[in-house]
Amino acid sequence: MDTWEDDRVDQRACLICGDRATGLHYGIISCEGCKGFFKRSICNKRVYRCSRDKNCVMSRKQRNRCQYCRLLKCLQMGMNRKAIREDGMPGGRNKSIGPVQISDEEVERIMSGQEFEEEANTSWSNNGDSDHSSPGNAVSESNQPSPVSTPSSSRSMELNGFSSLRDQYLGTPGPTHYQYLPHLFSFSAHPTIIPAQSRSLDPQSHTLINQLLTAEDIEPLNTPMLIEDGYKVTQSELFALLCRLADELLFRQITWVKKLPFFCDLSIKDYTCLLSTTWQELILLSSITTYSKQIFGDLTDVTSKYSPSEDELHRFSEDGMEVMERLIYLFRKFSQLKVSNEEYVCMKAINFLNQDIQGISSASQVEQLNKRYWYVCQDFTEYRYPHQPNRFPDLMMCLPEVRYIAGKLVNVPLEQLPLLFKAFLHSCKTIVTKE
């Protein structure tokens, strides 16, 4: 397996400048030049300046013209600075899968040098070099992706959900201080990844994808979601329906795990640990892909027959608002990408195989399995979509958002879930209608 994966790396382009990649460095596929530049910048605590608009084109020929924009793109693409030891010695500590997502505020602190000043007052002995780590898992050390800051007004979208519902039932304008469309999927206005040439799909990728497709249950959901015309759904009835739906989706994820092609490779203890940590994320992924027709069709019709009270609207929490806006953006992103079944099953396996979860006894084996499907997904996207060079990074950057949303959902009071899903589904229906 390692030989095949190493061969696949040789065909990759550096995600920073488009030069030929030499391997997985600090969590992402990159060339030796960008690997060394990032390491020197972090170890030497460099603070750069851009003489233009902080949006310089990064390419093999132009990457040395602006060090500020080069380091900025390293951070935006997910290079993990915490995987570098200040003494430059090897021996990685923070092995993770997929790029590390950090907030705008944290990026700004690094670029301005403030982060280095703060770290100077703390111990640096825990840092380690991860040149040989697999692609990073887009989670922080606490196993939760970093929150994504709100974008500038020029990149925000009008939310058609909660604010319009509030206006409808209260007759007053909704709050205007919320910003939507987190920026985390937009890396640069200038794509720099070299488009893949037309080629065939690797036979091993084809086999592994077919195995995942076979494990997926694509049968329609059994939970009844049909309501007579004119019937008014109460909050408790909608909540009970959401619970039944969640139960069925969870049962399907348990069945899915038992059908995975690598089920015999891990212990029951590790599977239990992985599933107990990722089940909400798996349900979310399957809801916006495999079962989206029923979720955004039948369930939307049910929620439309539920009218929240004035008190429910007033008591809707900040956590509920944040979860809703992120759900809307995730739905829009999946709709724009038109995520295929093959990509979905790979993303689901990658998300499930998170070796950073505490309590796993075979973390290295989980990591190798994760790397396998990381390469399979990249191989497939480059084969199926050769003219969309940024597609694979876009897909992978959806995963930290899925994890963040799932983690935030537990903070939303149970009694607010009916309103949350009504507003979310109403907004998504509006988005689909406009598009």
UniProtKB/Swiss-Prot annotation:
Zn finger limits (NR C4-type): 14-34, 50-69
Composition bias type Polar residues, residue spans: 121-141
Chain residue ranges for the region called Disordered: 84-158
One MF annotation (Gene Ontology) recorded for this entry: zinc ion binding
Expression sites by tissue: Transiently expressed in differentiating cells of all embryonic germ layers. Expressed in an anterior to posterior concentration gradient from late gastrula to midneurula stages. Shows a complicated spatio-temporal pattern of expression during neurulation, being predominant in the neural plate and neural crest in midneurula embryos. At late tailbud (stage 30), mainly expressed in the head mesenchyme, gill arches and tail tip.
GO CC terms: chromatin; cytoplasm; nucleus
Family indicated by similarity: Belongs to the nuclear hormone receptor family. NR6 subfamily.
Domain NR LBD: 204-435
DNA-binding region residue numbers: 11-86
Classification via Pfam families: Hormone_recep, zf-C4
Domain of life: Eukaryota
SUPFAM superfamilies (alphabetical): Glucocorticoid receptor-like (DNA-binding domain), Nuclear receptor ligand-binding domain
Family annotation (InterPro entries): NHR-like_dom_sf, Nucl_hrmn_rcpt_lig-bd, Nuclear_hormone_rcpt_NR3, Nuclear_hrmn_rcpt, Znf_hrmn_rcpt, Znf_NHR/GATA
Coiled-coil region(s): none
Aminoacyl-tRNA synthetase keyword on record: no
This protein's name: Nuclear receptor subfamily 6 group A member 1
Keywords: Cytoplasm, Developmental protein, Differentiation, DNA-binding, Metal-binding, Neurogenesis, Nucleus, Receptor, Transcription, Transcription regulation, Zinc, Zinc-finger
Compositionally biased tracts (Low complexity): 142-156
Quaternary assembly: Homodimer.
Gene3D superfamilies: Erythroid Transcription Factor GATA-1, subunit A, Retinoid X Receptor
GO biological process: animal organ development; anterior/posterior pattern specification; cell migration; midbrain-hindbrain boundary development; neurogenesis; regulation of transcription by RNA polymerase II
